[in-house]
């Protein structure tokens, strides 16, 4: 296996497992050497992966896992602001449960635009456990396929969506690397306002601990998809609105940097 191939393999393992050894071992012990074979392995009738997410939540929350389950499901499928979640759940108030999921169980994280105020309305949530994020996004959203054992169709959906989903994993991976470097006082993202459109969104912004300096990064699976001119415009907007006192270092993070 060439080093390039083994890098691809590591990325695929990380995308599905978030690096959890138990899941990685299952893939390796069963000879899963590609994204396709991992997906096919998870989608067998007797696969433990199909029920793993539920088992984890029952273990954490006992019989009361239902509401937490619904919240994680909503966030994994892009309903990531408090009003959106409360709408999905019939208008019930979720503040307390979100706080527990974040502070006691470390299953979700708040994302707010870098340097925005603590109480700002622009908070979004994300599931911080990579495996659960995957499990909810596919095994719960498409539960009907699993119930009638149409694993082929679901496998196709996951394989086609892999570029999008692995892009999210990539972003998480680089943020994790930045955290572990201990160089930053704050790491986040940036977007404008509540009804943000993608064009003003920046994937990663890190403020260095030592000086008034910021790392501003775009994450793309493949560097050929990077549009430097567009990124420069976004940085200008960010500089005007928030980072006017900072020296800005801009970076592209792609799969080659993993």
Segment roles from a protein language model:
Residues 11, 21, 25, 36, ...:
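Non-catalytic, well-ordered alpha-helical scaffold segments
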């Amino acid at each position: 296996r060439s080093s390039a191939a083994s890098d691809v393999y590591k990325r695929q393992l990380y995308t599905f497992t978030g690096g959890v050894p138990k899941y990685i071992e299952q893939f390796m012990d069963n000879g899963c050497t590609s994204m396709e074979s991992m997906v096919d392995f998870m989608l067998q009738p007797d696969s433990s992966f199909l029920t793993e997410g539920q088992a984890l939540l029952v273990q954490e929350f006992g019989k009361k896992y239902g509401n937490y389950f619904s919240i994680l499901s909503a966030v994994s499928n892009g309903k990531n602001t408090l009003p959106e979640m409360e709408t999905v759940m019939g208008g019930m108030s979720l503040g307390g449960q979100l706080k527990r999921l974040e502070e006691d169980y470390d299953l979700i994280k708040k994302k707010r635009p870098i340097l925005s105020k603590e109480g700002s309305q622009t908070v979004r949530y994300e599931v911080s456990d990579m495996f659960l994020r995957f499990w909810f996004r596919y095994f719960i959203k498409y539960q009907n396929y699993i119930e009638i054992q149409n694993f082929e169709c679901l496998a196709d959906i996951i394989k086609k969506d892999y570029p999008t989903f692995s892009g999210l994993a990539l972003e998480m991976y680089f943020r994790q690397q930045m955290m572990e470097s201990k160089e930053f006082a704050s790491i986040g993202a940036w977007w404008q306002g509540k009804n943000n459109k993608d064009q003003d969104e920046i994937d990663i912004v890190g403020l260095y601990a030592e000086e008034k300096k910021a790392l501003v990064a775009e994450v793309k699976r493949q560097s050929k998809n990077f549009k430097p001119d567009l990124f420069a415009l976004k940085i200008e907007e960010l500089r005007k609105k928030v980072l006017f006192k900072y020296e800005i270092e801009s970076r592209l993070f792609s799969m080659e940097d993993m």
